């Protein structure tokens, strides 16, 4: 909720990411340049720094870690083997899962006597324990299975908001919680006796600090005291809840900014000093219980700290990854609902003797919505499959990209539906009106899209900077590196016609050869744009926010293209129903994505004097100086 665009994005990059990295036997570079050896050196260095972490039996059964897929797009490297869409749920387990979901689908699809779904009903349906281990009376589902099992309840956005934040708390406890914390909380979380929820955001955060909510440690008692309030907390009044609270803390004997940190606490709603505040009258999701929560002198033990004290940013990666993936599922379900409602409306509506479905504009709108939903779903389950298939796989960027793409597209679909339906959509209670409100709520609650875009670009640039360091230094010092500059002059690679050597078409169905070529060209253009930005701006690249937003969109489009092609190729090869139309969908996504990537990268190459950024920045100074619109009336005389 902080207005500063860097508030969430840059903060998450301040902690070190330690994890085992297995350098692949052979990755494929998009363009031929001098970055190959640099990339290998960076990978070796990062692998050398990896710490040995004790792994669970579940992790040990997975395949070795691969290099990050989306991060490598920024340096022109692709992992062609990941074009094989993951199949992490065996056939027999998939059949059992589909059968177990039938009661859930029937409950949420069929009309109910009462619109309200009580927590007791959700307990009986077993929806609280989907991602809890079977050791604690849960279902024991992995990422892909738990997301698939969450689809029925995600059709009711007011119900699923509480369930998804509950599952985020479970995910964090499974990954970074101590054995004592897992034994204490997971069984109650699985059965619904205890309902987890995040308490992170504040309406008015401080200008300099992380949070107004603070926690102070009293070493002589071994206790923490928590004070403050959180907003936009999804509550279940009358039920026992477990709040996941991020609070600002100060390291002992380290004064000032150096000792400032964040700590993650687990706070039981029945503890003294915890009080539910008023319900927020939000723009969308109006039936959900979204409230303020007040913490007034709450005493917490050291066993209620998740991870290490003062080091909450270190565990933010696991927290936001889970939150983004499960939030993307909510957006995906809403987008599907909007598309289905629009299709029904166009089929059943006739105007001036013509069915709406026969109008070309309506067809184009429905097809674009279909492509967006297909890409959302492909990205979500590709990311989940990577987590399920590979050990400690880095999907930080993939999860952020999935949420970024999903929320942008679901809002676009919701707003465009208004134009198709017409003035009727303005009536209160219409499905189009409710859909627009819910889409706007998802886009605004939590991370803003601008902050998420900055995070995507910063993460990609951070990864690319390690690999491109040597080459960029030479390019920025041409007098001391004439051979390097001469090689650049002889290179006939261009942003309009980049050369690629990836041969992705060999790893997908032959019908997708053109789509694979679109991905190759887009990855090559992204790598060239990143290298140019480093060469032009150096360390000041983080200040070029408009260019970074373009980079974020390019990386997002490439991942959407990649996931769609991988999914469509699998569908056609195994003969799924309507797989030929999936090929058409993936081809349309890649064709449009290629053109958009070329436009964005050309704008980056042109610079701020060519792409109009300079004019807009200059204009903004006068807008700020005048505190708004500054032009006089167009009919004014000057005499």
Curated annotation (Swiss-Prot):
Subunit structure: Associates with mitochondrial complex I assembly intermediates during its biogenesis.
Residue spans of biased composition, Basic and acidic residues class: 48-65
Lineage, broadest ranks: Eukaryota, Metazoa, Ecdysozoa, Arthropoda, Hexapoda
Stated name of the protein: Complex I assembly factor Egm, mitochondrial
GO molecular function annotations of the record: flavin adenine dinucleotide binding; medium-chain fatty acyl-CoA dehydrogenase activity
Keywords: FAD, Flavoprotein, Mitochondrion, Oxidoreductase, Transit peptide
Region described as Disordered: spans on this chain: 23-65
Effect of disrupting the coding gene: Late larval lethal at third instar; larvae die before pupation. Larvae have delayed development and an almost 4-fold prolonged lifespan, develop subcuticular melanotic masses, have small eye and wing imaginal discs, and have malformed fat bodies.
Organism expressing this protein natively: Drosophila melanogaster
């Amino acid at each position: 909720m902080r207005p500063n665009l860097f508030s969430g994005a840059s903060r998450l990059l301040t902690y070190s990411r330690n994890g085992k990295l297995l350098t692949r036997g052979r990755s494929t570079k998009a363009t031929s340049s001098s970055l190959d050896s640099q990339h290998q050196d960076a990978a070796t260095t990062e692998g050398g720094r990896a710490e040995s972490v004790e792994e669970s039996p579940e992790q040990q059964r997975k395949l070795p870690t691969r290099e990050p897929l989306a991060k490598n797009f920024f340096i022109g490297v692709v992992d062609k083997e990941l074009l094989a869409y993951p199949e992490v749920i065996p056939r027999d387990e998939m059949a059992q899962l589909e059968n177990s979901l039938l009661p859930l689908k029937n409950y949420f699809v069929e009309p109910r006597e009462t619109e309200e779904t009580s927590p007791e009903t959700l307990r009986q349906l077993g929806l609280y324990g989907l991602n809890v281990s079977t050791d604690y009376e849960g279902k024991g589902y992995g990422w892909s299975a738990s997301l698939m099992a969450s689809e029925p309840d995600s059709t009711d956005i007011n119900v699923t908001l509480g369930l998804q934040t509950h599952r985020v708390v479970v995910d964090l406890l499974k990954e970074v919680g101590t054995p004592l914390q897992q034994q204490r909380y997971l069984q109650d979380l699985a059965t619904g006796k205890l309902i987890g929820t995040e308490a992170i955001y504040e309406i008015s955060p401080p200008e300099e600090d992380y949070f107004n909510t603070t926690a102070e440690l009293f070493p002589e008692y071994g206790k923490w005291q928590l004070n403050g309030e959180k907003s936009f907390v999804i509550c279940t009044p009358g039920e026992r809840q477990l709040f996941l609270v991020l609070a600002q803390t100060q390291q002992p004997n380290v004064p000032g900014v150096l000792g400032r940190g964040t700590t993650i606490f687990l706070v039981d709603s029945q503890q003294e000093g915890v009080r539910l505040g008023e319900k927020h009258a939000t723009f969308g999701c109006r039936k959900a219980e979204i409230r303020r929560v007040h913490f007034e002198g709450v005493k917490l033990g050291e066993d209620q700290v998740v991870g290490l004290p003062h080091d909450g940013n270190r565990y933010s990666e696991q927290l936001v990854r889970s939150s983004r993936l499960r939030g993307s599922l909510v957006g995906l379900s809403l987008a599907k609902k909007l598309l289905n409602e629009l299709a029904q409306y166009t089929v059943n509506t006739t105007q001036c003797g013509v069915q709406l479905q026969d109008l070309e504009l309506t067809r184009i709108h429905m097809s674009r919505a279909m492509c967006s939903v297909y890409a959302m779903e492909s990205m979500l389950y590709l990311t989940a499959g990577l987590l399920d298939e590979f050990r400690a796989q880095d999907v930080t960027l993939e999860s952020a990209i999935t949420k970024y793409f999903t929320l942008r597209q679901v809002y676009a679909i919701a707003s465009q539906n208004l134009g198709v339906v017409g003035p009727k959509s303005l009536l209160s209670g219409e499905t189009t009106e409710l859909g627009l409100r819910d889409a706007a709520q998802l886009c605004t609650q939590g991370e803003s899209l601008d902050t998420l875009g900055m995070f995507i670009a910063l993460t990609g640039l951070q990864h690319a900077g390690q690999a491109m360091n040597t080459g960029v230094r030479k390019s920025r010092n041409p007098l001391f590196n004439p051979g390097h500059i001469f090689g650049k002059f002889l290179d006939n690679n261009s942003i309009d016609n980049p050369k690629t050597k990836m041969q992705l078409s060999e790893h997908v169905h032959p019908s997708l050869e053109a789509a694979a070529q679109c991905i190759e060209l887009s990855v090559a253009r992204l790598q060239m744009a990143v290298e140019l930005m480093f060469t032009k701006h150096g360390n000041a690249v983080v200040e070029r926010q408009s260019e970074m937003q373009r980079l974020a969109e390019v990386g997002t489009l490439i991942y959407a293209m990649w996931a769609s092609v991988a999914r469509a190729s699998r569908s056609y090869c195994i003969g799924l129903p309507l797989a030929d139309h999936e090929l058409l969908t993936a081809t349309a996504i890649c064709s449009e994505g290629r053109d958009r990537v070329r436009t964005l990268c050309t704008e980056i190459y042109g610079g701020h004097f060519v792409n109009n950024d300079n004019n807009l920045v200059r204009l903004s100074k006068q807008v700020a100086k005048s505190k708004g619109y500054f032009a006089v009336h167009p009919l004014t005389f000057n005499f």
